[in-house]
Amino acid sequence: MASGYLCLVLHWHLPFVRHPEHPRFLEEDWLFEAISETYIPLLSVFERLEAQGIPFRLTISVSPTLAEMLRDGFLQERYLAHLDRLIELAGREVRRTRDDLAINRLAVMYLERFTTCRTLFVDKYERNLLKGLIHFQRSGNLDLITSSATHCFLPLFQVVPQAVKAQIQVAVRSHIRTFDSYPKGFWLPECGYYPGVEEFCRQYDLDYFFVESHGVLYADKRPKYGVYAPIYCPNRVAAFARDPETAKAVWSSEGGYPGDPVYREFYRDIGFDLPTDDLKEFLPGGELRSNTGIKYHAITGPGERKRVYNPKAAEKRVHEHAEHFVSARIEQVRRVAGFMDRPALVVCPFDAELFGHWWFEGPQWLESLLRKTAARRDELAMITPGEYLQRWPELQTSQPCFSSWGNKGYAEVWLEGSNDWVYRHLHQQALRMSELARRFPKEKGIRRRALNQAFREMLLAQASDWPFIMKMGTTVPYAVRRTREHIHNFTRIYDSLMTNSLDQEWLFSVESKNKLFPEIDYQSYVA
């Protein structure tokens, strides 16, 4: 038995963005960047480890909205068009930078990366990256779990519990259809927990979820093992707490690994550095500057002046940081061993997009970490929450407290002056959806389609991504537009059903655009 265990959890999520009404849409690039920079690199890490017989165990939560986009043929085609543009742009960069050896080497690196992404996407994964996840689930390397249907921040919907239930119910059904397996765990979006949400988890046979550290540390009974073991809620659904030491080492913008000066600078991209005329063919609309993924500079320091990125120096630092992380975790579990009657558990949940997208070297670091952990598994072994609960089923029972991993630890990010206006509409929608389901209990044909689409629009409006963007001040007009659009669509369907004036042509256009959750059933909303 190992001295301690490491539970590594990667959360794969993006909001549902799909715009067939436009030939190209900037926000669809969120998905395309994540595929090229995070999802394919992570799957490649798993492929190399498997090929070399190196054991690894991870938990990956896949949000239903992301799964729907990854399987969507329309978005798969658009991703290939996106890649083809990048391959052409990288080829031009190789020619443009031929007189600058250091920059030219990087241009060649990007050309090779984009070309490899295309080959893997088409030939290996047959355009569907979910196949890669399913393979590693069946091999026993990954434990796949789900999250709420549209990544709703559940604590702000406890006043309409039918909405919380619907988010979890639709998520579980979507996961079964996607992965042909039942999820045993649940990722609370933003680790947003409120007392009582575990009742819906138990209703759908979800055995565990994750919370921020203080969700367990401030539970109604002081946790005997702190964050080093899960606790049971009163209904025996387990809550696993995020370890604050590892969160600081990896997440911190000041002292965390991703901020090292030799690593690649995220915010210097040729999409902003080169003259617009040189990029017209590659920018949305020919003039809207955006990230291309081609970046030539290292973080260097806080100032404007940046050194040219050196991949070899970065690779060396990756292994140093992986060694530091593993050694620190071994020391950590040894430090608390005297206070425990079981091996300490260190829970490390992360947004997957940190690895590769925000932190370019993240997949390399993860691979090095997994290799080093495998080599020292007598001291620190990988484990999934399900395995932990099988080995140590007797846990302390306590009631976690309201918490999230957002700024200041509660709900301030998703409920404040920039976004508080949405909730009166979202709560009213949830109540009106109940009204529709009761008033039209056994509809068929076009009315049933309308009711199911109303259900979809309600769920899409509840996504936590939109209030988050409003708070952070990034693509605010888009987040506001999406929220209003789904509220409008729902309201129009509601009004038309109440007045028997359904516009079929309009309904078909909305179904075609917001095309997800084909198994959705409005009748289940009040079941």
Model-derived regions, located:
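Acidic (Asp/Glu)-rich catalytic clusters
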Residues: A2, E47-P55, N128-T146, I176, ...
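Active-site and substrate-binding clefts of carbohydrate-active enzymes
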Residues: A2-R57, V62-V108, E112, K221-A527
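Short, solvent-exposed turn/loop segments enriched in Gly/Ser/Thr/Pro and often Arg
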Residues: S61-L66, S148-T150, G185-Y194, H214, ...
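Glycine-rich phosphate-binding "P-loop"
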Residues: S148-V170
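His/Asp/Glu-enriched short active-site or ligand-binding loop at hydrolase and phosphoryl-transfer sites
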Residues: F153, D207-A219, I383-T384
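CE4/NodB-like, metal-dependent polysaccharide N-deacetylase domain
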Residues: A163-L188, A328-P349
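Conserved short loop/turn motifs at secondary-structure junctions
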Residues: P183-Y193, D351-F355, T475
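Hydrophobic, small-residue-rich alpha-helical packing segments that form membrane-like cores
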Residues: G192, V197-L206, R222
